[in-house]
């Protein structure tokens, strides 16, 4: 990073305390008043290309790779997950479950705004608003978490999946700042409306706010007992920092959510392995809903995204750098000790199963932003660069996480102000 930095310490005891933990103090800058400012990309507008830093890969090579990935998932008829409909809309298709999810729709929108693909962005948003949005009833303002490719909500009043709304809101803010608000959509007002709507529920009809108002944490699902639990991978402190800055409503509440999310991620990360559970209580304890179809206390499907969330927050804001370096070091060293072999574990590392996946390779490479161990970071970055583009029936989830990870690691996943 071509920045003059100094360590954020005022006394040597603090520095020695960090060093005794094996964690380096985080570099900071000083602003014009001499006050320390974290050296995250939000403050510096400097986005690192780790492929270049660690592997010597040129910007031209990186750009070609990103274009290849775009064509793979959005253009190529044999491998894409982006499909356009006759009504000037488009959707991201979950090829494994054969449905359309707010998760994928919002990921697709984020990818499009990062790559300046406004036409595709608008078509995805048009589909989500037309088919997924509840315009009346107890879920009004929320988005049904999955639909058929023909736009029919699956099941009787399907609930929302909180990460969909989170990525919708943030991608709409970015769209507002990139393209303005005078086209097909006033993107800023679209984002503001969701932010207001999802915090306007009092529970009287069985539906609550997207965030638990006491814990300041995003809920697993804002209904029933699920309102009092979370999914660690839904906790995106870097996004919540931006909401606190840009929201027109509940600003004081949003200011409290980034640190709450950071604490949750730190609490949920196992103290030896660094592994996260798929679902947890608000204190980070692994949690499984009664009669659930699989053991959500394990590191399995959702949990792989936690490394991406932590890495993004580290390089965007750097406000919890010591904790984040420590938890990512535990996590990636655990995977290295497992020879990057398995995909699923109990959070203590027992009962390994499955094969180390494309999504894990991507998310862990984003986590490498927070590593002090440069050799391990290089190994993770190399794995991401070398990973073949996913194909076949289950290319959707791993593929979307992989594509966003490639944008992060190449310096192309940016805060669009």
Regions from the language model: what does each represent?
Residues 65-104, 113-157:
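Internal amphipathic alpha-helical repeat/solenoid segments
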Residues 98-105, 154-179:
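Aromatic-rich carbohydrate-recognition surfaces in CAZymes
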Residues 8-17:
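Bacterial N-terminal signal peptides
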């Amino acid at each position: 990073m071509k920045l003059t930095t100094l360590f954020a310490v005022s006394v040597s005891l603090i520095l020695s305390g960090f060093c005794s933990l094996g964690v380096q103090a985080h570099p900071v800058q000083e602003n014009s008043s001499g006050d320390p400012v974290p050296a995250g990309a939000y403050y510096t507008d400097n986005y690192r290309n780790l492929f270049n830093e660690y592997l010597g890969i040129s910007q031209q090579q990186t750009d070609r790779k990103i274009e290849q990935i775009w064509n793979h998932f959005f253009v190529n008829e044999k491998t894409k997950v982006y499909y356009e409909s006759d009504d000037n809309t488009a959707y991201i298709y979950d090829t494994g479950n054969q449905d359309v999810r707010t998760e994928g729709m919002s990921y697709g929108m984020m990818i499009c705004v990062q790559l300046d693909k406004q036409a595709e962005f608008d078509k995805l948003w048009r589909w989500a608003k037309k088919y997924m949005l509840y315009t009346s009833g107890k879920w009004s303002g929320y988005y049904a978490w999955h639909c058929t490719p023909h736009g029919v909500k699956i099941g009787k009043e399907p609930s929302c999946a909180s990460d969909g709304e989170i990525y919708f809101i943030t991608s709409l803010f970015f769209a507002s700042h990139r393209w303005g608000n005078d086209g097909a959509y006033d993107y800023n007002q679209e984002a503001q409306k969701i932010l207001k709507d999802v915090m306007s529920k009092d529970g009287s009809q069985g539906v609550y706010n997207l965030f638990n108002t006491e814990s300041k944490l995003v809920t697993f699902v804002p209904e029933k007992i699920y309102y009092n639990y979370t999914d660690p991978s839904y906790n995106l402190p870097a996004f919540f920092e931006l909401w606190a800055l840009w929201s027109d409503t509940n600003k004081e509440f949003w200011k409290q959510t980034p640190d709450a999310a950071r604490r949750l991620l730190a609490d949920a990360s196992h103290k030896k392995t660094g592994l996260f559970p798929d679902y947890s209580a608000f204190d980070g304890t692994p949690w499984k809903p009664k009669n659930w179809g699989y053991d959500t206390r394990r590191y399995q499907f959702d949990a792989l995204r936690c490394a991406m969330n932590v890495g993004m927050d580290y390089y965007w804001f750097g406000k919890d750098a010591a904790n984040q370096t420590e938890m990512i070091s535990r996590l990636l060293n655990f995977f290295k000790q497992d020879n990057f072999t398995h995909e699923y574990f109990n959070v203590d590392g027992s009962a390994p199963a499955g094969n180390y996946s494309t999504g894990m390779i991507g998310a862990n490479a984003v986590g490498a932003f927070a590593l002090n161990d440069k050799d391990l970071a290089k190994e993770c970055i190399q794995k991401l660069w070398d990973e073949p583009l996913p194909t076949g029936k289950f290319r959707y989830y791993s593929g979307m996480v992989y594509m966003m990870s490639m944008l992060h690691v190449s310096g192309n996943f940016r805060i669009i102000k």
